[in-house]
Amino acid sequence: MNAIDGTSRQLKDTEDQTLDDTPSLLSIIIDAHVPSWEEIKSQISISEAVASILVFINAHLALHNSNSVNVIGYNASGARILYPPKSGVESTRSKEREERSESVSDGEQAPSKKDHSMYRQFKTVDEVVQTELWNMLNHTNYVEEEKQHNSAISGALSLALGFINKHVFVDESRMRARILLLTVGHKNETIQYIPTMNCIFAAQKLKIPVDVCKLGPGSDQVFLQQACDSTHGIYMDISEKNSKTPKGLVQYLLSGFISDPSLRPHIVLPTQSNVDFRAACFLTKQVVDIGYVCSVCLCIMSQIPSNRRCPTCDTTYSEKTLAGLGRKPLKKKKKKVVKP
Amino acid sequence: MTSQFKNSINDYLEGLPEAVLTRLYQSPATCLAVFRLLPALARTLIMGMIFNPDPIAVADVDALVKPSSQRLKLETQKKLRLLHIFTETQAHIIINPTFKKNLRAALVGGDQNISFGVPCDTEDKHKVDVAFLDAHAVSQWEMILHFMVGTSIGRTPSDGVLNLLKHSGLMEPERGGLRITNAGFQFLLQDVNAQIWTLLLQYLNMSEYLQMDPVDVLNFIFMLGSLELGQDYSLSALSETQKHMLEDLRDYGIVYQRKASSRRFYPTRLATTLTSETAALRTASQSMEAATQDTISSSVAADSGFIILETNFRLYAYTESPLQIAVLNLFVNLKTRFANMVTGQINRDSVRFALSNGITAEQIITYLSVHAHPRMKGMEHVLPPTVVDQIKLWQLEMDRIRATDGYLFSEFKNFDEYKDVSTYAKELGVLLYENPGKRKFVSTLAGSQQIVEFVKRRNQKHRSSAN
Amino acid sequence: MPKATRGVLIECDPSIKALIVNIDSSQHNIILDELDDTHLMIHPSMVEVVKQKLNKMLAENTYNPNEEAAKATGK
């Protein structure tokens, strides 16, 4: 008679061989930092990369008819949501596009309204993403960009997480979410470590995998590898350093990064990372074994900072504490043992 | 619910020969629709292979899937093989080139193809808006359902529809009219999307009789699934078969044409949600908007529930639609009708009446939970477990005995004879029941003949060996 | 030569079997053979009769609030 028991005992299928067919929301964060793209111009041009990204977006939308996508671009001056556009923006943009058809660089053909040979869903997304991304790239102040070395990865991640939170959790639609970060490494890039790590922890809590696809020749950013590792995402470095070529970006995207969150438990993830979990000093960027730790924010330093302030949380250390750190350990005088 | 239609359209596609499938894959819209019907692992594999010019090694696929999910991989490969998307050689998997090319075209676009429908360039003098299309779809569809249930609504569907209902076994001719069958009852309890697919699949089966090319029919159906609501499309892109189909689809309410000679048609919501999840996936914010704007009727987009079921088996349905009341009447003892509501009780007799008409307990329970009022859906159990259990128990009551026609074999001379014959019957697979203690067993009707002959042969052998 | 008899194999639980044996005691043309606690062979043409009689006997033992209400209003 247990067979008819209607009370739902949530017996988990131990084999779990059936895949749940939930739609997923993909947040793509694209690096729009023009100087970085300039550096790798010989390996891949921006228009080729954008075309690959658009095909990837179409592929994601093709996987399930309720899949949706969210595109965010970031550069030194900040991050911006490119798709879905604010309502009202879309209609004005299409009007502007029809009036001046040559506002895009690299001689891209203005997408025409008459061309309906593509699936309508793909077409709308592609058009909006393309125009918005070109606008963002065109309107950046090139000179200013070169001077600033901040990159707004944390801003972009926060925007992505906020969007996901609204659409998946607040609206209670049955979707899973993931984030893909497409970055072109810049050798002098400084990131705000703590805000970025906060975003990563938030993603970890919400079980949102963060994937990273790195194109440029810059060194492996350890924090990105750690981000992928802690959220069970995929980290791939497609640069000539690893004897891969960014020209095949579309194939890497479609084979490595296409897997849905619901499919991930069943396949071996193509992540390449030997994550360096060793601690690194915040001042000298060297790996430390023994060092000093700030008592407020727990940041690690290999030497006492010269201005007596912590580099990350900016607390001032008092003279007395710092003086105490320089002391050598006290030697206890040994009492002479008198033999009887 | 959408998984049901997936299975049946999958079965239909798997039954087609390879040549037909290859012709089918020449349309990017069809490739996209078929792609979406595949299991998740298959979709991921195919995506990785679309832009890859070389075939993939089987070893690579094996390495991709975790060892604990091997069964998934085998099922996926089998399905892809049946649909002729993959051909496997000794060590490599090659993807069907037509499928590959056209799926790529669907993703990349630019190729001048008409499989996604050609919208009209000229303005329509009698333009219709989305609200009109919705109302039209609802009225056409409900007309068919009302006719099936038997509530007189004044209009009867056209001959083509009646023909389809007869052929599909949903209704049977009886004394000059049509009467609903058991299958028809089950059809009524399905949700709109599943109902449309059932009819379309029947239409596909019928089309082979009518000498219509199934490839054209399927292409058109999948194209409809990718059209935009509110946009008119021209007939110039359709083949003769497809134009012919348009007349039938007009009767079902899937497309709208102002008159039969019109050069344009509008897809309705029934068409655009063909290949998507159950009607409109409304989010909380959208529902708020809709409530304040007072838009679309709720009977087509079956996402607003109206049934409240209490633990004392009483049922309250906030609906005025005669169709829904008629469906409820199939298994609920309706007692009172108010201006905006009907009340009744689910009891043994009403459920047994439904069961004897061929409706299963599962269907009743699914219908109730799909149309449950949003307040019920918020609770831990959508329907009270007592009621759910009781409906299932009533169904069990119906078949307390299982009867099978057969032959009883008894009076064996000795145990060896019994053992030989019963083992033979077991190997044939016709043994229903055996009792070694009493040396009796029962076999099916069909198998009895073979057993009798076996016994004769055995006896002859023994007699000859004894002599 | 073993004997082969045409019939219908009935699978049920012991309580139902007891009910069928009970029906048979008044009408002796139903059961061909009692095989064990849960299986019976009965005459092919008597299957429907058995089912109807079973339903009637089981219905007698179920509480039906509608009947109660009908009786109350009737009286």
Swiss-Prot record, chain A:
Main location, first listed in the record: nucleus
Keyword Oxidoreductase attached: no
InterPro entries registered for this protein in UniProt: TFIIH_Tfb4/GTF2H3 (IPR004600), vWFA_dom_sf (IPR036465)
Subunit structure: Component of the 7-subunit TFIIH core complex composed of XPB/SSL2, XPD/RAD3, SSL1, TFB1, TFB2, TFB4 and TFB5, which is active in NER. The core complex associates with the 3-subunit CTD-kinase module TFIIK composed of CCL1, KIN28 and TFB3 to form the 10-subunit holoenzyme (holo-TFIIH) active in transcription.
Superkingdom of this protein's organism: Eukaryota
GO CC field: nucleotide-excision repair factor 3 complex; transcription factor TFIIH core complex; transcription factor TFIIH holo complex
Functional summary from the UniProt entry: Component of the general transcription and DNA repair factor IIH (TFIIH) core complex, which is involved in general and transcription-coupled nucleotide excision repair (NER) of damaged DNA and, when complexed to TFIIK, in RNA transcription by RNA polymerase II. In NER, TFIIH acts by opening DNA around the lesion to allow the excision of the damaged oligonucleotide and its replacement by a new DNA fragment. In transcription, TFIIH has an essential role in transcription initiation.
Disulfide bond annotation, renumbered to this chain: none
Similarity comment text for this entry: Belongs to the TFB4 family.
Region of interest called Disordered, as start-end residue ranges on this chain: 85-117
Encoding gene, per UniProt annotation: TFB4
GO BP annotations, alphabetical order: nucleotide-excision repair; regulation of DNA-templated transcription; transcription initiation at RNA polymerase II promoter
UniProt-annotated location(s): Nucleus
Start-end of Basic and acidic residues biased regions: 92-103
Species in which this protein is naturally found: Yarrowia lipolytica (strain CLIB 122 / E 150)
GO terms assigned for molecular function: zinc ion binding
Name of the molecule in the record: General transcription and DNA repair factor IIH subunit TFB4
Keywords: DNA damage, DNA repair, Metal-binding, Nucleus, Transcription, Transcription regulation, Zinc, Zinc-finger
Zinc finger (C4-type): 294-313
Curated annotation (Swiss-Prot), chain B:
Pfam families in the record: Tfb2, Tfb2_C
GO cellular component: transcription factor TFIIH core complex; transcription factor TFIIH holo complex
Primary residence: nucleus
Record's subcellular location: Nucleus
Gene Ontology MF annotations: ATPase activator activity; double-stranded DNA binding; RNA polymerase II general transcription initiation factor activity
Cysteines joined through disulfide linkages: none
Keyword Heme recorded: no
Top-level taxon of origin: Eukaryota
GO biological process, one term: nucleotide-excision repair
Alphabetically ordered keywords of this record: DNA damage, DNA repair, Nucleus, Transcription, Transcription regulation
Function: Component of the general transcription and DNA repair factor IIH (TFIIH) core complex, which is involved in general and transcription-coupled nucleotide excision repair (NER) of damaged DNA and, when complexed to TFIIK, in RNA transcription by RNA polymerase II. In NER, TFIIH acts by opening DNA around the lesion to allow the excision of the damaged oligonucleotide and its replacement by a new DNA fragment. In transcription, TFIIH has an essential role in transcription initiation.
Similarity section: Belongs to the TFB2 family.
Assembly description: Component of the 7-subunit TFIIH core complex composed of XPB/SSL2, XPD/RAD3, SSL1, TFB1, TFB2, TFB4 and TFB5, which is active in NER. The core complex associates with the 3-subunit CTD-kinase module TFIIK composed of CCL1, KIN28 and TFB3 to form the 10-subunit holoenzyme (holo-TFIIH) active in transcription.
Protein name: General transcription and DNA repair factor IIH subunit TFB2
Organism: Yarrowia lipolytica (strain CLIB 122 / E 150) (Yeast)
Swiss-Prot record, chain C:
Similarity section: Belongs to the TFB5 family.
Name of this chain's protein: General transcription and DNA repair factor IIH subunit TFB5
Pfam families per the UniProt record, alphabetical: Tfb5
Organism: Yarrowia lipolytica (strain CLIB 122 / E 150)
Subcellular location: Nucleus
One Gene Ontology term, aspect cellular component: cytosol
Keywords noted in UniProt: DNA damage, DNA repair, Nucleus, Transcription, Transcription regulation
Origin organism lineage: Eukaryota, Fungi, Dikarya, Ascomycota, Saccharomycotina
SMART domains, per database record: Tbf5 (SM01395)
Quaternary organization: Component of the 7-subunit TFIIH core complex composed of XPB/SSL2, XPD/RAD3, SSL1, TFB1, TFB2, TFB4 and TFB5, which is active in NER. The core complex associates with the 3-subunit CTD-kinase module TFIIK composed of CCL1, KIN28 and TFB3 to form the 10-subunit holoenzyme (holo-TFIIH) active in transcription.
Keyword ATP-binding in annotation: no
GO biological process: nucleotide-excision repair, preincision complex assembly; transcription by RNA polymerase II; transcription initiation at RNA polymerase II promoter
